[in-house]
């Protein structure tokens, strides 16, 4: 840390750090708090910012006030991103919980997103196992296990074969 940087108030340094973190991608409030509290890697190793709890609260409040930090926007974008990568609703819920998002906010966003989880599960299965999907029991079990690992619900997985049989 240079001498001019060390003389800057902790609040200004935290605000600068928050802006840099949020410029890369959206974060949940809990993620941002964790990253702000982590030591900064400097030329001489990890360096702490000697900020008070009030400084952290002011930075978080400023980010909320100016629209840089919005948990509902983060949740919506996170759900869209993870579903595009082929993950199901159970896995997405778990990851959002780990990121400090409340269950209510997660459920609200899951209801508002317009994603056909059954179609997404079928796409993942055909991408991995090819078309047509196997009907042999042992192969079906492999596909079910794969989709459960990806976070799909059993009802969506079973619908793949119900719709396939029609």
UniProtKB/Swiss-Prot annotation:
It is found in: Cytoplasm. It comes from Escherichia coli O7:K1 (strain IAI39 / ExPEC). The keyword Cytoplasm applies. The gene is recX. InterPro entries: RecX_HTH_2nd, RecX_HTH_3rd, Regulatory_RecX, WH-like_DNA-bd_sf. One of its GO terms (biological process) is regulation of DNA repair. PANTHER family: REGULATORY PROTEIN RECX FAMILY PROTEIN. This is Regulatory protein RecX. It comes from the Bacteria. Belongs to the RecX family. The keyword Cytoplasm applies. Keywords: Cytoplasm. GO terms for cellular component: cytoplasm. Modulates RecA activity.
